[in-house]
């Protein structure tokens, strides 16, 4: 956790020094709605040419209050990296990912049709239990939504990460050299 007012004060310092490109890499940005709204409002109040904001978001969590603020930004300011990862329910369960796929699609459609945000959606291949066929079906499902970009990422294992419990039963093989 962090002190939001102290954080915004530091953002103000950066903004006053001329920073206009901000990339937030908290993958749960939109789960803390009060903080999300404050951060977005901070930048909405300071709209200027060249302002660019990148946020990573959970795909199935876009409450109406957040949508209302997102819709106020003009084109070219917001970019959302939407971490879909997989549409395969069995894979989602295996990696302890709770994602409402129908809500994910609704939110992606909303971002693409009701906001001016640039939408970059992620899928990961190599997840435990994901087959070529299920990955292809997920890709097709995402492609039909027409995000501005689709990023296909290769699963990387971090030492000590819980995903290692699937290594043997899923026949997963990793490089011995980081990033594994």
Which residues make up each language-model segment?
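Conserved SAM/AdoMet-binding glycine-rich loop
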Residues: 3-121, 125-127
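Flexible glycine/acidic-rich beta-alpha junction loops that bind and position SAM and/or redox cofactors
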Residues: 33-34, 84, 89-95, 125-133, ...
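A broadly tuned preference for mixed-charge, low-complexity surface segments
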Residues: 72-81, 110, 135-141, 170-178
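Short, structured secondary-structure boundary patches
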Residues: 28, 43-47, 139-145, 172-174
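Short secondary-structure boundary/capping segments
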Residues: 38-42, 70, 96-100, 134-139, ...
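Catalytic cores of alpha/beta
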Residues: 65-70, 128-146
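N-terminal pre-triad scaffold of radical SAM enzymes
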Residues: 1, 23, 156-158
